[in-house]
Amino acid sequence: MRTTNVWLVVIVWVTVGWSSCTGRFVVEKNNLRVTSPESIRGVYECALGNFGVPQYGGSMSGAVVYPKTNQKACKNFDDFEISFRSRVAGLPTFVLVDRGDCYFTLKAWNAQRAGAATILVADNRPEQLITMDAPEDETSDADYLQNITIPSALVSRSLGSAIKTAIAHGDPVHISLDWREALPHPNDRVAYELWTNSNDECGSKCDAQIRFLKRFKGAAQILEKGGYTRFTPHYITWYCPEAFLASRQCKTQCINGGRYCAPDPEQDFSRGYNGKDVIIQNLRQACFFRVTNESGKPWLWWDYVTDFAIRCPMKEEKYNKKCADQVIQSLGVDVKKIDKCIGDIDANAENPVLKEEQVAQVGKGSRGDVTILPTIVINNRQYRGKLQRSAVLKALCSGFRETTEPPICLTEDIETNECLQNNGGCWEDKTTNITACRDTFRGRVCQCPIVQGVKFLGDGYTHCEASGALRCGINNGGCWKQTQMGKTYSACRDDHSKGCKCPPGFIGDGLKECKDVNECEEKTACQCRDCKCKNTWGSYECSCSGSLLYIREHDICINRDARGDFSWGVIWIIIMGLGAAALGAYTVYKYRIRTYMDSEIRAIMAQYMPLDNNPNTQLSSQLEL
């Protein structure tokens, strides 16, 4: 009876989960290009499998093989003495198998053990492509799921039939799988979500999730601290139907009046923790992220969830608020802020945090509904593949716009540096070890670099030239430069933003060669009648016969004595000119002073006696008469 009740509640939750979502499940698709034979050449769609390791950001070409026996790949190919291992220098093997009779994951595992590089599953129904997923039920041999590393894809029945027909006719079928556009990569920052759960008693899936959190934490924190990513954790919740609100099942699995629920960890209501404990811890983790994100340290969430899993496991009966608060305090976060965010879980009211989580579950645009735990969403596209550090990191790295990837995406275990072989076919200055090859996650680009503040200009493939004021400091701006007899000449000029020009005294292209100009033979200098010319490297020497002196500015020889006499004559003329000017100034000064004094004396005398030439005196005499 207890088991019946448990399954009844599980069925109700699944039904409610689907009915409450107005969105839909989106199949993540990828491009598959058939390059031969001519009859089926073209680009087709295929659906990414939700297991294995898709080569996000990369591509793979191979030859298709359709086995003569074990065509559904439900058995070990070794039993049929079939091997798909590539020959030396041969193309990788893409094995095509039929859908049906066993799990998709088992088909992939058998193909991988036989040496296949990729498995293509041909649909057996004329339907839209679906997502191949791992089995939900746990079996005794389910450990192989974690060991599947080859990519997988589902192709339509029509394409599968066309490939089989071509192989039957003896035509080699070559296919290229391209994952470079599987995820959008619009800019230099990747937004991704992790839909997770605090439950650690759900078997192998919970164990795999905790292992992933611990192993991925370092990379996630590097990306977040560097501002390369914008991470958000999410938690799936359901609500209890109104008809079951008074039931024991809803009361032990839900909070806030049945609005937010989680399944019982052990699927046994009579022992251990219940769904209510899980939903509360999920809410606490969501609030922890909110508080730390507001303080500018969102990466602390990774420390909290991994520390909580270690210090507060259900098996040790520490999965509670007391243990959680200790972890929160150890990370320097205010517990009161977390509690305030959590709010009243017993109130018959909506919780803003969990309400947003329910809304976020519904797919929008190109993203489908979130129905599987765990789920990773990268740039609004659901990740398909293994929950493994390197696989997820590759997917994240493929979400960056090319040339904006962080250093962690360019390590050897993540991608192949294509600049190491023949410099990627790009321009290179071996003298200064400057190259235009820039390694990217998807391959490489040929782009003229910026070195020590100096920008190089060019096509990046055959030519790059330093530009700007500081360009001569880097390999002399790529221009000619030579030193002889203690003298150094350069064709690079700091006052020119680009280009090379041979200095005066040289002629050439300025890049590879500048030849000395013989001014004596070219008759461009030292050509006066008494001049004697001698060419030097980069210049010339000019002398005069006898006691003559060479004036370089005027290209002339003059007499040293004549030059001295001339100089003294100029000096005497200047002295005499200054003397004449002083004498003239003194004469004018004396005349003006004398005139001024005479007028002053006459004015004084006119006050005491009449003067003959005083007009005021004559006017006074006329008035008296």
Swiss-Prot record:
<comment type="function">
    <text>Vacuolar-sorting receptor (VSR) involved in clathrin-coated vesicles sorting from Golgi apparatus to vacuoles.</text>
</comment>
<keyword id="KW-0813">Transport</keyword>
<keyword id="KW-0653">Protein transport</keyword>
<dbReference type="GO" id="GO:0000139">
    <property type="term" value="C:Golgi membrane"/>
</dbReference>
<keyword id="KW-1133">Transmembrane helix</keyword>
<keyword id="KW-0106">Calcium</keyword>
<feature type="topological domain" description="Cytoplasmic">
    <location>
        <begin position="589"/>
        <end position="625"/>
    </location>
</feature>
<feature type="topological domain" description="Lumenal">
    <location>
        <begin position="20"/>
        <end position="567"/>
    </location>
</feature>
<feature type="glycosylation site" description="N-linked (GlcNAc...) asparagine">
    <location>
        <position position="433"/>
    </location>
</feature>
<dbReference type="InterPro" id="IPR018097">
    <property type="entry name" value="EGF_Ca-bd_CS"/>
</dbReference>
<keyword id="KW-0245">EGF-like domain</keyword>
<feature type="disulfide bond">
    <location>
        <begin position="544"/>
        <end position="557"/>
    </location>
</feature>
<feature type="glycosylation site" description="N-linked (GlcNAc...) asparagine">
    <location>
        <position position="293"/>
    </location>
</feature>
<feature type="signal peptide">
    <location>
        <begin position="1"/>
        <end position="19"/>
    </location>
</feature>
<dbReference type="Pfam" id="PF25011">
    <property type="entry name" value="VSR_TRX"/>
</dbReference>
<feature type="disulfide bond">
    <location>
        <begin position="472"/>
        <end position="492"/>
    </location>
</feature>
<dbReference type="InterPro" id="IPR056858">
    <property type="entry name" value="VSR_TRX"/>
</dbReference>
<comment type="similarity">
    <text>Belongs to the VSR (BP-80) family.</text>
</comment>
<feature type="domain" description="EGF-like 3; calcium-binding">
    <location>
        <begin position="516"/>
        <end position="558"/>
    </location>
</feature>
<keyword id="KW-0333">Golgi apparatus</keyword>
<feature type="disulfide bond">
    <location>
        <begin position="426"/>
        <end position="446"/>
    </location>
</feature>
<dbReference type="InterPro" id="IPR046450">
    <property type="entry name" value="PA_dom_sf"/>
</dbReference>
<keyword id="KW-0968">Cytoplasmic vesicle</keyword>
<dbReference type="GO" id="GO:0030665">
    <property type="term" value="C:clathrin-coated vesicle membrane"/>
</dbReference>
<feature type="glycosylation site" description="N-linked (GlcNAc...) asparagine">
    <location>
        <position position="147"/>
    </location>
</feature>
<keyword id="KW-0812">Transmembrane</keyword>
<feature type="transmembrane region" description="Helical">
    <location>
        <begin position="568"/>
        <end position="588"/>
    </location>
</feature>
<feature type="domain" description="EGF-like 2">
    <location>
        <begin position="468"/>
        <end position="515"/>
    </location>
</feature>
<feature type="domain" description="EGF-like 1">
    <location>
        <begin position="415"/>
        <end position="465"/>
    </location>
</feature>
<feature type="domain" description="PA">
    <location>
        <begin position="55"/>
        <end position="167"/>
    </location>
</feature>
<keyword id="KW-0472">Membrane</keyword>
<feature type="disulfide bond">
    <location>
        <begin position="448"/>
        <end position="464"/>
    </location>
</feature>
<protein>
    <recommendedName>
        <fullName>Vacuolar-sorting receptor 2</fullName>
    </recommendedName>
</protein>
<keyword id="KW-0325">Glycoprotein</keyword>
<keyword id="KW-1015">Disulfide bond</keyword>
<dbReference type="GO" id="GO:0015031">
    <property type="term" value="P:protein transport"/>
</dbReference>
<dbReference type="GO" id="GO:0005509">
    <property type="term" value="F:calcium ion binding"/>
</dbReference>
<feature type="disulfide bond">
    <location>
        <begin position="502"/>
        <end position="514"/>
    </location>
</feature>
<keyword id="KW-0732">Signal</keyword>
<feature type="disulfide bond">
    <location>
        <begin position="479"/>
        <end position="500"/>
    </location>
</feature>
<feature type="short sequence motif" description="Tyrosine-based internalization motif">
    <location>
        <begin position="608"/>
        <end position="611"/>
    </location>
</feature>
<dbReference type="InterPro" id="IPR003137">
    <property type="entry name" value="PA_domain"/>
</dbReference>
